[in-house]
UniProtKB/Swiss-Prot annotation:
Name of the protein: Ribonuclease H
InterPro entries according to UniProt: RNase_H (IPR050092), RNaseH-like_sf (IPR012337), RNaseH_domain (IPR002156), RNaseH_sf (IPR036397), RNaseHI (IPR022892)
Pfam families referenced in this protein's UniProt entry, alphabetically: RNase_H
Chain coiled-coil ranges: none
UniProt keyword list: Cytoplasm, Endonuclease, Hydrolase, Magnesium, Metal-binding, Nuclease
Cell compartments where the protein resides: Cytoplasm
Gene3D superfamilies referenced in this protein's UniProt entry, alphabetically: Ribonuclease H-like superfamily/Ribonuclease H
Domain RNase H type-1: 1-143
Summary of the function given for this chain in its UniProt record: Endonuclease that specifically degrades the RNA of RNA-DNA hybrids.
Keyword Repressor: no
An example Gene Ontology biological process: DNA replication, removal of RNA primer
Positions contributing to Mg(2+) 2 binding: D9, D135
Gene this protein is translated from: rnhA
Length: 146
């Protein structure tokens, strides 16, 4: 099966504040870098945007995709079943409060279903080449806001 590796990261200058996201997609010898920014956002939103935009950048379906992220928020929502629980519980968390960032989680769901996506935690700022590159892309995107 064809496999794509994705690294993602989000960053915020203040939380909330100006934020950016970056992603590196790799397929064999091919690589693509993407990034974006928002003037008023949170770090968690930027972490999710990085994953959403990376998955949107993939053409077609039926891919085996491995997403590496340093976001415990994103990784735990997938690996620990939070996302499924939130949907089942009418988008309420374990405290019976509205789930934060519902708009992004709802945008992510069909993208996760389109391909076979596995997520893996990478330790942030630990020297991982691709995580560091994504962080740089996200921070450069923030600077582009002016």
């Amino acid at each position: 099966m064809k496999e794509i590796i994705i690294y993602t990261d989000g960053a915020c200058s203040g939380n909330p504040g100006p934020g950016g996201w970056g992603a590196v997609l790799a397929y064999g010898e091919h690589q693509k870098e993407i990034a974006g920014a928002e003037a008023d956002t949170t770090n968690q939103r930027m972490e999710l945007m990085a994953v959403i935009e990376a998955l949107k950048a993939i053409k077609g379906s039926g891919w085996e995709i491995r997403v590496y992220s340093d976001s415990a928020y994103f990784i735990n929502a997938i690996q620990k079943g939070w996302l499924e629980n939130w949907q089942r519980n009418g988008w309420k968390n374990s405290k019976k409060e509205d789930v934060a960032n519902q708009d992004l989680w709802k945008a992510l769901i069909p993208l996760l279903r389109k391909n076979r996506v596995r997520v893996e935690k990478v330790k942030g700022h630990s020297g991982d080449r691709w995580n560091e590159r994504c962080d740089q892309l996200a921070r450069n995107a923030i600077k582009s806001l002016g």
